[in-house]
Amino acid sequence: MKNKMQLQFTARSRNESFARVRVAAFVAQLDPTLDELTGNQTVVSEAVTNAIIHGYEENPDGMVYVSAAICDDGTVEITVRDEGKGIADIEEARQPSFTTKPELERAGMGFTIMENFMDDVEIQSQQESGTIIRLKKHLALKNALCN
């Protein structure tokens, strides 16, 4: 049985911190280490920021959907979805330093950062239909807080 949560919000940069904090609060029930918690916050920030900046090109009318689940074995699954313009070439986009917006700070590092913090990163995208990023990380269970 999975414990689940869902969020949806408009594609505004200020909502990135909202998503990050909500997912961190949800994952906190596993009593993660500070590194694990920070890693989860970082990947949510990167995925949501990608949806806002690249998916919707900062059009605040778009919606971003975030869900998180905690599996019985302690695996955390996070999904970030948008209905934006999609990614033309996923393999190219996953290359370190590849960017379509070189003028931005840290441009091109989003997927690399996600891959460094998570056990599994899956990206599905269709042009003009949006992108789904699925992130998985196994956290060690601490029995006192999981029951």
From Swiss-Prot:
Q: EC number(s) in its UniProt entry? A: 2.7.11.1
One GO-annotated biological process of the protein: negative regulation of sporulation resulting in formation of a cellular spore
Q: Report which reactions are catalysed by this protein.
A: L-seryl-[protein] + ATP = O-phospho-L-seryl-[protein] + ADP + H(+); L-threonyl-[protein] + ATP = O-phospho-L-threonyl-[protein] + ADP + H(+)
Q: Which Pfam families match?
A: HATPase_c_2
Protein keywords = ATP-binding, Kinase, Nucleotide-binding, Serine/threonine-protein kinase, Sporulation, Transferase
Example of a GO MF term: sigma factor antagonist activity
Entry function: Binds to sigma F and blocks its ability to form an RNA polymerase holoenzyme (E-sigma F). Phosphorylates SpoIIAA on a serine residue. This phosphorylation may enable SpoIIAA to act as an anti-anti-sigma factor that counteracts SpoIIAB and thus releases sigma F from inhibition.
Q: Name the family.
A: Belongs to the anti-sigma-factor family.
Q: Please identify the protein, giving its name as recorded.
A: Anti-sigma F factor
Task: Kindly list the organism's lineage.
Answer: Bacteria, Bacillati, Bacillota, Bacilli, Bacillales
The protein's gene is named spoIIAB
